[in-house]
């Protein structure tokens, strides 16, 4: 007997020629228990009434679903003991989360050991929380007066929405559009720049990397955690969980089912620096 529940992904995927009733009947006949991303009880009721799907078949799926819900305790007493509130968001757990963020940060480049910066340095910000940065440095609104730039970037993506799933995820090209790249390079060339890039996907940024004095790979860490690293409150220990490609050409030419095979990656899988003593 099947253990668990069979759930289908969203969209028609190859049966776009069938109407909605035919699709649902085909899905259920294939052994599916839940329609992922859909709420179609009226369609299922009509299929049973018309005899296209038997009530016995529906009961099999209902049994599987309810069994898992009972296992999870979803039908038990929904009221928690008030003393259990102390478990949620307690300081010990919060510190575990902060430590995970610290350990995830990857120092990719540190030219002439520019990092860590000295506290009280004059910095120009782009993408960072100003109030958090003021705890470490003098934040300048003028590039001319700044000693360094601290720049935060996100991995590029394309805003395609032809398919439903694309609306929920960043996808498409991994390199910066030429206009945006030119703007960033113009900024970076004015002062020594510490570039922090959020690597939700493996970004392609060789020119920005070359012109930056320091580069940090970030995985959605809080600004104060990143600033702790920049100003030497802890040493970086993170390693890249994937390689960073050197070009979009390398991305397009690599094999989709073979890891770490892009040509001349900018940074290899597992790369990561730390501060010198």
Residue positions per predicted region:
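C-terminal non-catalytic regions of proteins with extracellular/luminal or membrane-system context
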Residues: 2-20, 41-55, 67, 95-277
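Mobile "lid/hinge" segments at catalytic clefts and subdomain interfaces of large enzymes
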Residues: 23, 28-35, 41
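A short, mixed-charge helix-start or loop-turn motif at secondary-structure junctions
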Residues: 26, 47, 86-90, 169
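Short polybasic/polar patches that bind polyanions
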Residues: 28, 49, 70
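Terminal amphipathic helices with adjacent charged low-complexity linkers/tails
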Residues: 53-70, 75-81
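An alpha-helix initiation/capping motif
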Residues: 59, 63, 91-98
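Long, charged amphipathic helices and adjacent flexible linkers at domain junctions
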Residues: 74-96
